[in-house]
């Protein structure tokens, strides 16, 4: 392996590990991801640092918590005074490419051009700000706001085609490349091609004990059209379609003779409740929203392995800089996961912190959720004995030790990460559109 590999980072939107066969959910068909996992390192427990799009993306690019970047909700812009992963890799001699959904320019949540000064340092940018209605009829831009590129057919297919062309351009450059490919799928509203939808119609998709078939919907206009069963048919079909596109992308990587010197990482910004606990969407601290897939194939790796190393969003920037032999400005949090990707043992017990409308502290076994953005505990779950999080152990006398331990961890984190002069009431947490 060359010392400085290319890096292909594939980010999908609203795909929880809970819904993938790689993580034990056999109702969904994802053969390409299964094949990729079989030759990669699968992190069994990866936790998003924020279960919402913009805060997550700010964390990914900065290596810092939302409370440190100020990106606490959707519709905010990546701060100009924060260096990004692209900046660090540019300094390390990489060509940096971004393809797909951005959601970091502060513009309204719609399909629009992203100006160069809002691109967080990426040298080559082919993307758009936010949503395309039902994954069809989308537009994507390079540098001219008046020259939009139409994405015919389904957005996932068109975006994959664009990414494969961009890969060929990147491969021709003398410098190593970093490409962040950001899919919007399987973010609802879902409209998978018929062939993928048919795989799930007329099948019972309501197997979990924490499901609520009459679940409350965040989006009022979905109520008339979806029940949990129908939502899952569409959502799972979107996952299978995305899986097929990911397989095409990997085959193109092989055709370009890039496999032996390219680190490939597949992950998601957050999960999807899909009717669990009577909820849809994200923005909460249940496992369906927090637990994301994280699968990494090191350059030249061909044998799969699984690691119990607890991973978090803030680990991704230091991991990629470790492979690239790059340096940050010392402000990034997290730890490099390179040792585990290369087959090393887990580094031991740690606490992963997540934040949005609540704070949450997670270990391999326990999860503590606060009441709003305070340190008042609201729920404590034993993830090993109660994987569907049906029994709140907060007031169980036998669970006082993990409650105290995680409460102290949150207190230390808050003192370190949350700016004391920030007026958080201005964010109106219950009104945020996610």
Language-model region placement:
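Formylglycine-dependent sulfatase
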Residues: 1-372, 376-378, 387-434
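Residues forming the ATP-binding cleft of Hanks-type serine/threonine protein kinase domains
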Residues: 384
């Amino acid at each position: 392996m060359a010392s400085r590999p290319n890096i292909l980072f594939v980010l999908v939107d609203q795909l929880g590990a809970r819904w993938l066969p790689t993580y034990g959910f056999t109702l969904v068909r994802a053969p390409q991801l299964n094949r990729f996992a079989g030759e990669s390192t699968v992190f069994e427990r990866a936790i998003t640092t924020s279960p919402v799009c913009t805060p997550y993306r700010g964390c990914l690019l900065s290596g810092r918590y939302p409370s440190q970047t100020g990106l606490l909700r959707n519709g905010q812009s990546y701060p100009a005074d924060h260096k990004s992963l692209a900046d660090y890799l540019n300094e390390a001699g990489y060509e940096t490419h971004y393809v797909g959904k951005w959601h970091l320019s502060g513009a309204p949540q719609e399909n629009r051009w992203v100006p160069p000064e809002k691109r967080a340092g990426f040298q080559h940018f082919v993307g758009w700000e936010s949503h395309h209605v039902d994954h069809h009829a989308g537009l994507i831009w390079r540098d001219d706001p008046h020259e939009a590129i139409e994405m015919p057919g389904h957005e996932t297919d068109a975006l994959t085609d664009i990414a494969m062309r961009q890969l060929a351009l990147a491969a021709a450059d003398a410098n190593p490349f970093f490409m962040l490919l950001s899919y919007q799928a399987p973010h609802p509203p879902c409209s998978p091609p018929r062939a993928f939808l048919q795989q799930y119609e007329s099948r019972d998709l309501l197997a979990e004990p924490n499901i609520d078939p009459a679940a409350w919907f965040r989006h009022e206009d979905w109520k008339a059209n979806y029940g949990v069963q129908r939502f899952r048919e569409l959502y799972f079909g979107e996952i299978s379609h995305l899986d097929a596109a990911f397989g095409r992308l990997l085959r193109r990587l092989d055709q370009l003779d890039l496999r032996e010197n390219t680190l490939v990482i597949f992950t998601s910004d957050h999960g999807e409740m899909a009717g669990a606990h009577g909820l849809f969407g994200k923005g909460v601290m249940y496992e369906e929203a927090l637990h994301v897939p994280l699968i990494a194939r090191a350059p030249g790796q061909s044998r799969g392995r699984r690691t119990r190393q607890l991973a978090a969003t803030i680990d991704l920037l230091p991991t990629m800089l470790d492979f690239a032999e790059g340096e940050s400005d010392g402000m990034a949090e997290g730890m490099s996961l390179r040792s585990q990707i290369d087959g090393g043992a887990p580094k031991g017990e740690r606490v992963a912190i997540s934040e949005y409308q609540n704070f949450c502290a997670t270990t391999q076994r326990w999860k503590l959720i606060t009441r709003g953005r305070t340190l008042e505990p609201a729920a404590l779950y034993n993830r090993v004995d109660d994987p569907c999080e049906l029994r709140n152990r907060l007031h169980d006398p036998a669970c006082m030790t993990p409650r105290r331990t995680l409460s102290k961890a949150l207190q230390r984190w808050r003192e370190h990460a949350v700016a004391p002069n920030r007026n958080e009431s201005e964010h109106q947490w219950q009104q945020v559109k996610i």
